[in-house]
Amino acid sequence: MTPNRRSTDSYNMLGASFDFDPDFSLLSNKTHKNKNPKPPVKLLPYRHGSNTTSSDLDNYIFNSGSGSSDDETPPPAAPIFISLEEVLLNGLLIDFAIDPSGVKFLEANYPLDSEDQIRKAVFEKLTESTTLFVGLCHSRNGNFIVQKLVELATPAEQRELLRQMIDGGLLVMCKDKFACRVVQLALQKFDHSNVFQLIQELSTFDLAAMCTDQISIHVIQRVVKQLPVDMWTFFVHFLSSGDSLMAVCQDKYGCRLVQQVIDRLAENPKLPCFKFRIQLLHSLMTCIVRNCYRLSSNEFANYVIQYVIKSSGIMEMYRDTIIDKCLLRNLLSMSQDKYASHVIEGAFLFAPPALLHEMMEEIFSGYVKDVELNRDALDILLFHQYGNYVVQQMISICTAALIGKEERQLPPAILLLYSGWYEKMKQRVLQHASRLERFSSGKKIIDSVMRHGVPTAAAINAQAAPSLMELTAQFDAMFPSFLAR
């Protein structure tokens, strides 16, 4: 009794059958057995003896010979020159397409002229069956000749290729590491109408699944990077939903994609479409701010909040909103979280002066002191495994301002604020020095407050007070007529 076999589409060429698995993941070559099998075809570049400067891609040699035993050396085979037309006539096109060297030959010899009859024959052969076309897309080697078709396709050929992609399972192609290259190139090379149809098809898929898949996310990234924003507004609307945003941001691939979307929407305010992009950006950022606390505490989503806080330009308003609405009044708890503590560090570093003042004051005096343990927020953070990094950042900010590492020149009144914060932290560190020395983080904190060259409040006041010569110059400028007498 004949065993049951999976039904497959086969192509018979020169005594060989090419069977495609139903998932189109690979293309297998099954040759009929014979007593003297022909060895694999080896493709070698050939240079004509009379013209050593000609391109290696102009001609190729196929070396073939009869089978021989291991102890025999086969006679040298005569070179056989073959053209693309002969490949077609001999039914070897698919053989070449799935062979590493053969596909290079096809790419190099695929005619550029859209009216060339051989080119039309190659295109028709490779697209005559959806099963064959999709099988090549999923093939390690075959995808390269399909990319060549996509790159040089006329509008009519683009429509045919698009039909093949959709009929063959576009979502499956997006999730395959070879076929996804074909889809990405189509997004880049097809004309507007065909790309629009391709985007319309993509918009019907499970976007959350695509954004969290390490292969298909490259297709979405190509959409965001290459195409006009008005072609992927559907994706921004998708992200602007709380559940969708959390699903994408909490993924190690998706969190980077959200940053790229923000970057694209906020870029180049001088372009005419900026007003439209700002509306989309505001919709997305409203959702991010609303979910800021949850995002900050996630292993991957916290990078999105950090990215917003570190951004400049139009994003500064959203940075300030996040600090004001989400971080303030939660600094102590978030500083003790493994991932949110990174967000707090960034907020201290990039906060504008007014918000930085509020953050510092919250740490120093914003929480009720634990009377039984005699500890306040600063004491807790000094000895916490994550909170100590926040304290180190606070010390670093004050030190940079006091020794003149700030980009802008700070007035004496502001410097006195930094000096006051620095002295509070220094006194507290010295008070707990014996305990802090037990930990490597504690030793770093002690070293940071014992640095030389940090001016005190008295030194800042002395520097701010005008000297006798400065007072004289000011007096002369105010009363020039007095000196003329």
UniProtKB/Swiss-Prot annotation:
Function as written in the Swiss-Prot or TrEMBL entry: RNA-binding protein that binds to the consensus sequence 5'-CUCUGUAUCUUGU-3' in mRNA 3'-UTRs and modulates mRNA expression and stability. Functions redundantly with puf-5 and puf-7 in oocyte formation and organization, early embryonic cell divisions, and repression of expression of glp-1 and other maternal mRNAs in late oogenesis.
Annotated SUPFAM superfamilies: ARM repeat
Region annotated RNA-binding, chain positions: 439-454
Domain of life where this protein originates: Eukaryota
A Pfam family it matches: PUF
Biased composition regions of type Polar residues, renumbered to the chain: 55-68
Source species of the chain: Caenorhabditis elegans
Protein name per its UniProtKB record: Pumilio domain-containing protein 6
Segments annotated as Pumilio repeats: 86-124, 125-163, 164-200, 201-236, 237-279, 287-324, 326-361, 372-411
